[in-house]
Amino acid sequence: MSAATATAAPVPPPVGISNLPNQRYKIVNEEGGTFTVMLCGESGLGKTTFINTLFQTVLKRADGQQHRQEPIRKTVEIDITRALLEEKHFELRVNVIDTPGFGDNVNNNKAWQPLVDFIDDQHDSYMRQEQQPYRTKKFDLRVHAVLYFIRPTGHGLKPIDIETMKRLSTRANLIPVIAKADTLTAQELQQFKSRIRQVIEAQEIRIFTPPLDADSKEDAKSGSNPDSAAVEHARQLIEAMPFAIVGSEKKFDNGQGTQVVARKYPWGLVEIENDSHCDFRKLRALLLRTYLLDLISTTQEMHYETYRRLRLEGHENTGEGNEDFTLPAIAPARKLSHNPRYKEEENALKKYFTDQVKAEEQRFRQWEQNIVNERIRLNGDLEEIQGKVKKLEEQVKSLQVKKSHLK
């Protein structure tokens, strides 16, 4: 056979394997997606404004002035907001987990416990649903991302921030965020970021970072990888952490005839989607546009599987000093009674009940003593009256004797 004949052989038609991504796209587009994000941080850091700006719609209403004047909550609450968003015929079920009351008290000891319990409960609930015979419709509220809002003090992280992030980072994808970054100058912001990164590294707090291996880094530098732009984008996101954000839901004219979402000050505008002003666009890319599936898959393959493995192996809580992962030995249904904050309230209620019982017992003893004293007084009065009656009877007898003598 000649070389010309060999090269002229017909190329077989494709079998259709390359069409698999299109099939997958169709399935995902029909099923839609679910994304659950937890907002953690002190009150007044713009969490509600940020989430509304992120999805460009009003998912949560801001607390009114009347609500802000209510007494400070003694415990951390869990507030769940659900919404169905649609963009280009694709539906995304969004669950926003807010944590009002976190960090608002003078004593914030164990303030992170309700957050940790909630994340563990969702893992446990999903695991129990997987063990059921019929699993066609599973309710999934597992947290895919935790946005931890840091107050822009310019100094560093507070102990409650460090402890809470350490606890959350072993259970969910933790993303630290510097709130209200426009209150710091550019130099102060960079120094603040550097301090936070140093503390995160020293405390071995695991934060979510875009996947970036060593080979990808080299390819990005040389430009040999066709995905080098994506790798470079991931590197920029990593360098920008913790993200400095500014929140606003109002639009203003930027002086060029364009309406932009911004915060207006006497000296000018702080544009939300301007990379030179804040990191909002980078955080949005991490959460939605570029790495949403990575957040979901990491939750499933790492955090949930870790919880499931430890639960099935019967591991118990290894103590406060374990920095890897601590799994409560008790069932989630009984966690409430073992929560340290509820323990404090339980002890306070027991003390109050004991004090009330003692007060009532003291009151009854005093009442009994008063009755005894009254009985003694009445007996004395009765004896006195009986004595008077006896004397009167003797006098009557004496008079009767005298009367008989006179007759």
Curated annotation (Swiss-Prot):
Region of interest (G4 motif), ranges: 179-182
Residue ranges for the region (G1 motif) are 41-48
The segments labelled G3 motif in the record are 98-101
Question: How does the entry describe its membrane topology?
Answer: Peripheral membrane protein
- What are the recorded Gene Ontology BP terms? cellular bud neck septin ring organization; cytoskeleton-dependent cytokinesis; maintenance of cell polarity; mitotic actomyosin contractile ring assembly; mitotic cytokinesis; protein localization; septin ring assembly; septum digestion after cytokinesis
Q: Which SUPFAM superfamilies match?
A: P-loop containing nucleoside triphosphate hydrolases
A GO molecular-function descriptor: GTP binding
Record's keyword terms, sorted = Acetylation, Cell cycle, Cell division, Coiled coil, GTP-binding, Membrane, Nucleotide-binding
Mainly resides where?
membrane
Q: Which residues bind GTP?
A: 41-48, 75, 101, 180-188, 247, 263
Q: Where in the cell is it found?
A: Membrane; Bud neck
Q: Where is the Septin-type G domain?
A: 31-314
Please give the Pfam families that the UniProt record associates with this protein.
Septin
Q: What does the subunit section of this Swiss-Prot or TrEMBL entry state? A: Component of the septin complex which consists of CDC3, CDC10, CDC11, CDC12 and probably SHS1 and rearranges to a cortical collar of highly ordered filaments at the mother-bud-neck. A complex formed by CDC3, CDC10, CDC11 and CDC12 is capable of forming long filaments in vitro and the components seem to be present in a 2:2:2:2 arrangement in vivo. The filaments are proposed to be formed by the end-to-end polymerization of CDC3-CDC12-CDC11 complexes with CDC10 serving as a bridge to bundle the polymers into paired filaments.
Full protein name: Cell division control protein 12
| Species of origin | Saccharomyces cerevisiae (strain ATCC 204508 / S288c)
Phylogenetic placement of the source organism: Eukaryota, Fungi, Dikarya, Ascomycota, Saccharomycotina
Name the gene that codes for it. CDC12
